């Protein structure tokens, strides 16, 4: 029982990105319910701060993606943060360390902490089923337990001797089963009859650098075919300058409604989204929206990634449905024309092939149901078992 563990539970967490900050915030809700006097320290963002995290560094310090020069440029700073964090945690001796995603940073840290007797939990299984299967050995050495957000993962990890629990995907509870498109449009000043394309070029600066201009060039081509279409772009403050720069470079700034955050409102309001591969694609699927998934990265990162990829899909909706239910355009294939053509197919399907859109929505509804669990409670219970073990 929770009361057998000190009510003054000391938890350390690291979340390295916006998506991890959201997941960790929900996890803290579950922990706080069991241990109201809990204290939490580490690395995180605003969602974690709202739940009482004392942030030693902001999560933006770890928000870097790729394998090549994108990582090498920040390597020294990130290694320095990890070294300082390890020293502080070994001095403080928290009851449990929870690494939220960010496996490149967290697994090494977890391995060091576990070796010194600190309980370690990893929230969001590294995608050994998609690529980098060699990582399974490091996971086994580094963590006491993995909290999985996809239902097939615990059995896969168990085959490698790793304890794991399926806790559902928190977003499946945050996003309503039947999103209110009209309310979302009203909130954004859009009419029910408008045709709306949401453009989400990523949550990292490197993604904005590689995708935003290309996405807005595609929007220009779509605008030529359908001048009445509304384009909505949610932008978090840290990325807004880069997004606005790309908008000006594309000549589309007058046609793009760039708004502060509100990505969920934007996805609820849209008819179709042009979207960077990542967690946002799962959000779009849970909103039951047709999408075109794209990704571009540095040449070296791409060469490494394509050699390690184990599945034919990159986008989470396609991976989870085990089929190309929505198009993916990657690297050199993600031209402005190809992106525009793929979006226009969805726009035209609304009138010409409504059954195609209905079938997609049915698949996404089934996926939503499968992922919907009481994640904060299940995760807190699993952590409780680790603490008692």
UniProtKB/Swiss-Prot annotation:
Superkingdom field: Bacteria
Catalysis performed (reactions): a lipid X + a UDP-2-N,3-O-bis[(3R)-3-hydroxyacyl]-alpha-D-glucosamine = a lipid A disaccharide + UDP + H(+)
InterPro entries from the UniProt entry: Glyco_trans_19 (IPR003835)
GO biological process, one term: lipid A biosynthetic process
Keyword Lipid biosynthesis included in the entry's annotation: yes
Molecular-function GO term, any one: lipid-A-disaccharide synthase activity
GO CC terms, sorted: membrane
UniProt keyword annotations, A-Z: Glycosyltransferase, Lipid A biosynthesis, Lipid biosynthesis, Lipid metabolism, Transferase
Pfam families per UniProt: LpxB (PF02684)
UniProt pathway annotation: Bacterial outer membrane biogenesis; LPS lipid A biosynthesis
Keyword Transferase in annotation: yes
E.C. no: 2.4.1.182
Function description: Condensation of UDP-2,3-diacylglucosamine and 2,3-diacylglucosamine-1-phosphate to form lipid A disaccharide, a precursor of lipid A, a phosphorylated glycolipid that anchors the lipopolysaccharide to the outer membrane of the cell.
Family from the record: Belongs to the LpxB family.
UniProt cross-references to HAMAP family, sorted A to Z: LpxB (MF_00392)
Identification of the protein by name: Lipid-A-disaccharide synthase
Gene name per UniProt: lpxB
């Amino acid at each position: 029982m929770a009361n057998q563990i000190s009510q003054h539970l000391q938890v350390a967490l690291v979340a390295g990105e916006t998506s991890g900050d959201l997941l960790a915030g929900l996890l803290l809700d579950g922990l706080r319910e069991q241990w109201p006097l809990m204290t939490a320290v580490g690395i995180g963002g605003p969602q974690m701060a709202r739940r009482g995290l004392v942030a030693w560094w902001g999560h933006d310090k770890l928000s870097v993606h790729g394998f090549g020069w994108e990582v090498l440029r920040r390597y020294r700073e990130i290694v320095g943060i990890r070294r300082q964090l390890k020293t502080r945690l070994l001095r403080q001796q928290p009851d449990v360390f929870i690494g939220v995603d960010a496996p490149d940073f967290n697994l090494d840290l977890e391995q060091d902490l576990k070796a010194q007797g600190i309980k370690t939990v990893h929230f969001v299984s590294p995608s050994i089923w998609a690529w980098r299967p060699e990582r399974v050995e490091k996971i086994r050495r580094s963590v006491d337990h993995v909290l999985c957000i996809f239902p097939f993962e615990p059995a896969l990890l168990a085959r490698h001797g790793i304890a794991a629990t399926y806790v559902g995907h928190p977003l499946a509870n945050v996003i309503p089963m039947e999103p209110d498109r009209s309310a979302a449009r009203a909130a954004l000043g859009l009419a029910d009859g408008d045709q709306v394309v949401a453009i989400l070029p990523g949550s990292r600066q490197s993604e904005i650098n590689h995708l935003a201009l290309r996405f807005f060039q595609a929007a220009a081509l779509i605008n030529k075919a359908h001048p009445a279409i509304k384009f909505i772009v949610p932008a978090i403050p840290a990325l807004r300058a880069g997004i606005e720069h790309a908008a000006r470079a594309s000549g589309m700034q007058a046609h793009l409604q760039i708004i502060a955050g509100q990505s969920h409102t934007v996805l609820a309001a849209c008819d179709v989204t042009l979207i960077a591969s990542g967690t946002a694609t799962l959000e779009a699927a849970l909103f039951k929206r047709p999408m075109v998934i794209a990704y571009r990265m540095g040449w070296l990162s791409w060469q490494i990634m394509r050699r390690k990829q184990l599945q034919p899909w990159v986008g989470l909706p396609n991976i989870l449905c085990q089929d190309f239910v929505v198009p993916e355009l990657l690297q050199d294939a993600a031209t402005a024309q190809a992106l525009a053509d793929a979006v226009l197919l969805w726009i035209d399907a609304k009138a010409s092939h409504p059954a195609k859109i209905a079938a997609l929505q049915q698949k996404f509804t089934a996926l939503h149901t499968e992922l919907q669990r009481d994640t904060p409670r299940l995760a807190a219970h699993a952590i409780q078992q680790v603490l008692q073990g």
